[in-house]
Amino acid sequence: MESPMTSTLHRTPLATAGLALVVALGGCGGGGGDSRETPPYVPKATTVDATTPAPAAEPLTIASPMFADGAPIPVQFSCKGANVAPPLTWSSPAGAAELALVVDDPDAVGGLYVHWIVTGIAPGSGSTADGQTPAGGHSVPNSGGRQGYFGPCPPAGTGTHHYRFTLYHLPVALQLPPGATGVQAAQAIAQAASGQARLVGTFEG
């Protein structure tokens, strides 16, 4: 007959082995949950709505309601008529200190002839009526030494002349060379400009 102590000693290794098995199973099974590894977190991609693009910058433009680009200039705006400036409309992008307007004739008999120069035009959009100078602008003497507009007046028999109405975008306030007029002033404006837009009208000589 075994003594109580002997029976206890025989059972102790079995109990210890059983406890170790429970601990091992608990460590492997994670409490009975899914033993697969959790995949790494991947943030969702952020997309930009392609249907709402940023607003486009306003372009530099010049036009006239009295004649289209490349079309004849009405006689009322020439020396054969009232000799007043045609109405104009224009727009410019942001960033200009001022705008400038130069009207010239590259087909003049004696070479390039500047008919009108206006500097200091307020940036942005604007318009003029017949005979008006753009807002904020002041005239620089043209090739004939005259301040203000002088319309098409080509000699007879000289063919088609092209009158260029060029609007310049000036990023800083214009400083013309002292005494600059006509072609010299027009060249200084073109060199200082960061952009230009042009309207061309024709007139027969």
From Swiss-Prot:
This is Putative lipoprotein LppC. It is a lipid-anchor. It comes from the Bacteria. A lipid is attached at C28 (S-diacylglycerol cysteine). It is found in: Cell membrane. Its main location: membrane. The lineage of its organism: Bacteria, Bacillati, Actinomycetota, Actinomycetes, Mycobacteriales. InterPro entries: PEBP, PEBP-like_sf, YbhB_YbcL/LppC-like. Residues 126-145 are annotated as: Disordered. One of its GO terms (cellular component) is plasma membrane. Keywords: Cell membrane, Lipoprotein, Membrane, Palmitate, Signal. A lipid is attached at C28 (N-palmitoyl cysteine). Residues 1-27 form the signal peptide. The keyword DNA repair does not apply. Belongs to the UPF0098 family.
